[in-house]
Amino acid sequence: MGLPRGPEGQGLPEVETREDEEQNVKLTEILELLVAAGYFRARIKGLSPFDKVVGGMTWCITTCNFDVDVDLLFQENSTIGQKIALSEKIVSVLPRMKCPHQLEPHQIQGMDFIHIFPVVQWLVKRAIETKEEMGDYIRSYSVSQFQKTYSLPEDDDFIKRKEKAIKTVVDLSEVYKPRRKYKRHQGAEELLDEESRIHATLLEYGRRYGFSRQSKMEKAEDKKTALPAGLSATEKADAHEEDELRAAEEQRIQSLMTKMTAMANEESRLTASSVGQIVGLCSAEIKQIVSEYAEKQSELSAEESPEKLGTSQLHRRKVISLNKQIAQKTKHLEELRASHTSLQARYNEAKKTLTELKTYSEKLDKEQAALEKIESKADPSILQNLRALVAMNENLKSQEQEFKAHCREEMTRLQQEIENLKAERAPRGDEKTLSSGEPPGTLTSAMTHDEDLDRRYNMEKEKLYKIRLLQARRNREIAILHRKIDEVPSRAELIQYQKRFIELYRQISAVHKETKQFFTLYNTLDDKKVYLEKEISLLNSIHENFSQAMASPAARDQFLRQMEQIVEGIKQSRMKMEKKKQENKMRRDQLNDQYLELLEKQRLYFKTVKEFKEEGRKNEMLLSKVKAKAS
């Protein structure tokens, strides 16, 4: 015995759907596609078609690495509002996935499977492709992780042979690499044609090839293939021509070799490094040997090619001048780079300062906008009073600053007068006064003036103290008003409190509903247990008394009468339960009707609020136009 279930959606108004054969066929195809893609939840018969289709679409979207803010695993048989919200969230994700098919939320909520099918088909295809891509990626990642931790026997053998193989390859390349055996003279004439340069380069590395002869042999082979056999005169002419070419080739090689020197002799020439490595000679002898060698070398080069020496010196001078120019340009380039670096640093600093100023300006604008928003929501009378108090505070501060400046000036003037009086009352002044015969009343008048100044100073000081007390009192009043204003919650805070209370109420309602369901389930199971115990006890009693009751006709009649009484009691209990069931059903229908009426009132309320807001907006626009015309 399970819990009694009401109608699906608890009596909510359902959207009309096309219950024709084509819709059912499309639904079957959609479910088959989802199951084939791997969404086996579509096989559950207890789920509604909406839960299966929407769950499958959400599963496909999530498989394609797109987020949908829904939870279909623990919430089924949703209300119409939840269904619409789910449909809107799914439809909002499809454009981000670049789905080529159009779909509206009301089509999903209304279960229009004809229009849902192409979208589901595309989603399943995309999900399968994503699975394959992720499978390849996960496979390669798994292989790389395996190779980081473990290795195969073939890899171990390869690592063992790797170092030896690399060493062998390096040794072979070192042994068989080309080695230069000859080198052309520095003053030798430059080879103009490419074939001669190739011959000279190969001869430097000890290789002698007759390219002309080879090409001639190739030509002869071509002629042999083209001409018929038996032409002896032509063959003799070709042989003679080949001998002449071979002799010319040998002569050419010899002429190239005469312009080269062996690398062993070249290496035996003195250089700065070889001279520096000579051990056992003093520096004077080394310098003398180097100078003698340079003179002999210059004499030999002058004897061999006096005209080419001038060209070499001119070339050397050009090289030196070009090197100097390169050094100057390099130095100038470094200076430009340093200047560019400093300018770039200044530019970055200025850019950073500009960004900070822009950020600070935006922050000030936001704070000003927030302040204006708070001012617009606050009470105008309190705001006006606060503004007056702030203006009074600023005025008092400015008066205090002016009074302090005036007091400083007055104090400076009085101190200057005191210094002057002290200077006048100096001993020299006293002697001069006594010697001149002036009366002592002058000193008394000066003292009276000092007392007057002290009295005025004390009065001003007391006045300043009173002003400070007044300012402190005003500041205290302003602080009290600030606290009172802060204690009054703003409209945004009230809205936030309202939202939190609504959320808390919804949570409490959900917990209460769940607890109520648990109580109902417990009571149902408890009743089921009681009835089963009664049934078991009745069957045991019948089983125990059956053989005794069948022993005599009187006992059998009494047993049958007892059984009829028991059956009658069971029927009465069943009638009571049926009556209770009908009462609960009627109560459920009444509550369902009340719920529908409340939904209609809610819809009307939302519609009225929307119209009221629209009228309020129009009223504000008209008021602003009237104010603009009046101004």
From Swiss-Prot:
Chain residue ranges for the region called Disordered: 1-23, 214-243, 421-447
An annotated GO BP: endocytic recycling
Coiled coil: 309-631
A Pfam family matched in the record: CCDC93_N
GO cellular component, one term: intracellular membrane-bounded organelle
Composition-biased stretches (Basic and acidic residues): 215-225, 421-433
Stretches for region Sufficient for interaction with WASHC2C: 448-631
InterPro entries the record matches: CCDC93, CCDC93_CC, CCDC93_N
Location of the protein in the cell: Early endosome
Top-rank lineage group of the source organism: Eukaryota
Keyword RNA-binding: no
Keywords: Coiled coil, Endosome, Phosphoprotein, Protein transport, Transport
Region (Sufficient for interaction with CCDC22): 1-430
Chain positions with Phosphoserine modification: S298, S301, S305
Job of this protein: Component of the commander complex that is essential for endosomal recycling of transmembrane cargos; the commander complex is composed of composed of the CCC subcomplex and the retriever subcomplex. Component of the CCC complex, which is involved in the regulation of endosomal recycling of surface proteins, including integrins, signaling receptor and channels. The CCC complex associates with SNX17, retriever and WASH complexes to prevent lysosomal degradation and promote cell surface recycling of numerous cargos such as integrins ITGA5:ITGB1. (Microbial infection) The CCC complex, in collaboration with the heterotrimeric retriever complex, mediates the exit of human papillomavirus to the cell surface.
Family: Belongs to the CCDC93 family.
Subunit structure: Component of the commander complex consisting of the CCC subcomplex and the retriever subcomplex. Component of the CCC (COMMD/CCDC22/CCDC93) subcomplex consisting of COMMD1, COMMD2, COMMD3, COMMD4, COMMD5, COMMD6, COMMD7, COMMD8, COMMD9, COMMD10, CCDC22 and CCDC93. Forms a coiled-coil heterodimer with CCDC22; this heterodimer interacts with the guanine nucleotide exchange factor DENND10; the interaction is direct. Interacts with WASHC1. Interacts directly with WASHC2C. Interacts with SNX17 and SNX31.
Protein name per the record: Coiled-coil domain-containing protein 93
Organism: Homo sapiens
